[in-house]
Amino acid sequence: VIVFGGSGNTMDDLYNAQEVKQGKFIGIASAKSKSYEKNYHCRHLGYGVNKNVQAPTILTKHGIPCILIGKVADIVANDKGESISCVPTEECLKLTVKAVREHDTGFICTNVQETDLAGHAQDSTRYKEILEIADKGIGELLPLLSEDDILIVQADHGNDPDIGNSKHTRECVPLLIYRKGLKGVNVGVRKT
């Protein structure tokens, strides 16, 4: 269950975003609701997730700073770390660059959610724009990384905006691993 809202939309926006699935499930299409446009807040009410086996809990128990930026800050427990909830890709990446500058060591996890939102909205133009913003942000991040740092860029699922529906898609997703001075190799298709 996801509880979300913002002040950049109206009740009409919410009514117009209502969807009925299989004739019995009623919900709000979040991207259509305009809730993300201003003062967005979100809570993911997960069930049965043991925070003691999640990376932030394990890492902070061992003294490793943990910073979660973007949607991941809403859905992963980080009791002893720093969690910054935000949606705009440019803001998420600026916060990531800031975190890298401020911390000599640690685990920083940033979630770019706007590609997911553009996919659900079936907006390929917006999807492309978000990829370009992310590419620029990663380009600003790379010079800040040392030979001790590892950057992993990945996706948890596809969301093809041109597939003809607003659901997650199952195509292969990127897995890019970068370390300064490391020769590039093809890691092949990985199993999930």
List each language-model region with its residue ranges.
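Feature captures the catalytic ectodomains and active-site-proximal regions of enzymes
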Residues: 1-192
